[in-house]
Regions:
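N-terminal ligand-binding lobe of clamshell/alpha-beta domains
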Residues: 1-243
Length: 243
């Protein structure tokens, strides 16, 4: 089987499954595992369709949020397109199991699923918010993968009633007094200056018992699904143990 992956997190997962030999093309943003020597076919939103066709893939993996429908439609003229859209940890488990079946790596898939199960432990309850963009400020709502990931270890998203990625002013959100503000460095490249600004604002809104800003930290721990989910859960359990 020849596959092209237009989803960096799926590229990493395919190699973790031991199916790397099936991968004949990847994006410019596929950085795990390190030192990949596969042909690059452009960005997630700017793929080179002609180059993908030249690779003669049987399957092209895409993600509903990361890739554009017009590119999926163009690729579907010469290859099977499999679209993924995991929004929960359970979705990730199903995705890994599906990839295991597709690439005849069922045993390895179950090993990865077991690692997710082993690290999916709810401990201390804490409230949180997660910004993903600035200018305007945007946050993870309750129906996002990021929210479900944090909730799986005991978190409570203060914006859980909002859908997708609502745009809300930073003062309004921090007035909710979250225990933790998680600050990933992608998709927006938040800096230490942003962390200091959020910490000051949070302290002003709840001076008696202000929450903590954690970050910036590698955003792929929160935004990449698949095998990277395991690393994300381990990161959260480390944070949780210090609450």
């Amino acid at each position: 089987m020849r596959v092209v992956s237009l989803v960096p997190s799926l590229t990493e997962t395919l190699f973790a499954l031991g199916a790397g030999d099936d991968v004949v093309g990847i994006t410019d943003f596929c950085m795990f595992p390190e030192n990949l020597d596969r042909p690059r076919v452009g960005g997630t939103k700017t793929p080179d369709i002609a180059k993908i066709r030249q690779l003669r893939p049987d399957i092209v993996y895409i993600n509903v949020e990361e890739n554009l429908k017009k590119h999926a439609d163009a690729i579907a003229r010469f290859a099977r397109v499999i679209a993924t859209e995991p929004k929960t940890i359970d979705d990730v488990v199903k995705l890994i199991e599906m990839l295991g079946r597709m690439h005849h790596r069922e045993r390895r898939a179950q090993e990865l699923v077991q690692q997710i199960t082993d690290n999916r432990q709810q401990r201390t309850s804490f409230s949180f918010v997660v910004p993903i963009w600035k200018k305007p400020w945007m946050w993870c709502g309750g129906d996002t993968y990021v929210s479900n990931l944090v909730e799986s270890v005991g978190g409570r998203n203060l914006l859980r009633e909002r859908t997708r990625y609502p745009s809300i002013g930073v003062d309004e959100v921090l007035a909710l007094q979250p225990d933790i503000v998680f600050l990933p460095d992608e998709p927006y490249a938040f800096t230490q200056a942003d962390a200091h600004h959020l910490a000051r604002t949070l302290s002003a809104s709840a001076p008696a018992e202000s929450g903590r800003v954690i970050g910036p930290f590698p955003g792929h721990l929160f935004t990449w699904h698949g095998v990277r989910t395991i690393a994300g859960l381990k990161f959260l359990l480390e944070v949780d143990s210090k609450i």
